[in-house]
């Protein structure tokens, strides 16, 4: 089915971009990727596509845990794909911001590997770890000056 091809394209393709952030953070291509949100915007197009072919998304009750549970229980593959692309886009955007921010603050890249991996796999956990890295970096800078 066509929607499975689109899902696989985004789901597999994002691995290449995360790999660039992790392995080649200073390369010109990586710097372009973190400077402009083209990758998350591209994923957003896939997200819009899946939303457009998903029925019932906008009638879901987002105000209660029961409403969200019901939405997930009744989800079709297109709706699940839309949700997954939502995660891919936001997590990657956050990863790009973290890498760019860490480079501006002169955080050594080995300190960024765990936060980036956790952002890719666990979203907010990566942001928490990055915040701790920044706190430690700030204390280290203060200690040496």
Predicted regions and their residues:
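Short aromatic-rich membrane-water interface segments that cap or initiate transmembrane helices
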Residues: 1-2, 68-82
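Structural signature of hydrophobic alpha-helical transmembrane segments
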Residues: 5-13, 81-85
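N-terminal signal-anchor/start-transfer transmembrane helix
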Residues: 9-31
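Helical transmembrane-bundle signal
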Residues: 14-21, 43-50, 127
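Alpha-helical transmembrane segments of polytopic integral membrane proteins
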Residues: 16, 92-99
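Loop-to-helix transition at the N-terminal end of transmembrane alpha-helices
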Residues: 28-50
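C-terminal TM-helix exit segments that contain a strictly Trp-centered aromatic cap at the helix terminus
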Residues: 47-58, 129-131
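Hydrophobic, aromatic-rich membrane-embedded alpha-helical segments
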Residues: 113-136
């Amino acid at each position: 089915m066509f929607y499975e091809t689109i899902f696989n394209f985004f789901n597999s393709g994002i691995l290449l971009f995360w790999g660039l952030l992790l392995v080649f953070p200073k390369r010109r291509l990586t710097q372009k990727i973190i400077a402009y949100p083209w990758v998350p915007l591209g994923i957003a197009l896939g997200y819009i596509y899946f939303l457009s072919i998903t029925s019932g998304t906008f009638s879901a009750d987002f105000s209660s845990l029961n409403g969200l549970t019901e939405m997930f229980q009744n989800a079709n593959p297109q709706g699940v794909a839309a949700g997954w692309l939502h995660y891919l886009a936001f997590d990657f955007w956050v990863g790009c911001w973290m890498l760019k921010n860490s480079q501006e603050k002169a955080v050594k890249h080995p300190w960024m590997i765990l936060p980036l991996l956790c952002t890719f796999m666990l979203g907010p956990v990566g942001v928490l770890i990055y915040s701790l890295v920044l706190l430690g970096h700030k204390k280290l800078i203060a200690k040496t000056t």
